[in-house]
Amino acid sequence: MKKHILPIVTILVLGLGISSCSDYLSVERFFKDRQSEEKIFKSKVFTEQWLAKCYNCLLETNLEITRIFYSTTNFADDMIFNETSGAISYNAFKFGQYDNTWTNNSYIRCYEGIRQASILISNVDINEELTEEEIADYKAQARFLRSYFYWLLLRKYGPVPLVPEETISIDGDYTSMSYPRNSYDEVVDYISKEMVLAAQALPEKRDRQNINRATKGAALAVRAKALLYTASPINNPRPEDPDKFSDFTDHQGRI
């Protein structure tokens, strides 16, 4: 009898051990906890964090005035200067010892912010924890930020591609994700129209806790400045003046 019991017990113990190992090595539970856009935008807290990430893309090299390290604007005159050596030093700008890689993070951050804002605009309506007024305000803020990122890009790089407002799939090939550069007028027209839409839903003032968020006045001010720059032949050369920037045309002959 003992001879029969021992193999049975051994098999049971091994079976339990294999089962427990199988449960331990299973990764299915991690995928169940993984965030999705639907989970994020059904939560008020996560939606607010997503909007905060959009604002976060305005930091560092996208700020007009900031601490010495990040903004090259601080080197425009002698009012402020920092250490004479280091990652971004006063002497490097003073003696022209810099290249285009020093501030190219701005391009990446702007398109990151554009993508974040577009995703919020497309998905925030499913949130049942936010009021209709809050949803309208969040969408307007995201719309303002998306347009403002294009304004920053236009000022620094001239005409840039206007990417589709729907989310671009990262599974596509290079051709499907490659978009041609739009003309100067097309980019400004987009900024102008989007800022008008944003201004319609943005408040004129915000409380002290939200004082740094977009307002109606901010949207209209950016629109006015973009249109002012567009009217200048220095920033936006016209066909009637072909001598200026004639080498900076695309394959269709557009400046």
Residue ranges and their predicted role:
Residues 1-8:
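Bacterial N-terminal signal peptides that target proteins for export
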Residues 10-14:
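Hydrophobic helical h-region of N-terminal Sec-dependent signal peptides
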Residues 238-254:
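A solvent-exposed, charged loop/short amphipathic helix patch at secondary-structure junctions
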Residues 15-42, 191, 224, 239:
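Bacterial Sec-dependent N-terminal signal peptides
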Residues 42-62, 66, 83-157, 176-211:
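Conserved, well-structured interaction surfaces
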Residues 21, 25-26, 62-63, 80, ...:
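Proline-centered turn/helix-capping motifs that create local helix->coil transitions or kinks
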Residues 154-155, 161, 229-238:
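Short coil/turn linking the two alpha-helices of tandem helical-hairpin repeats
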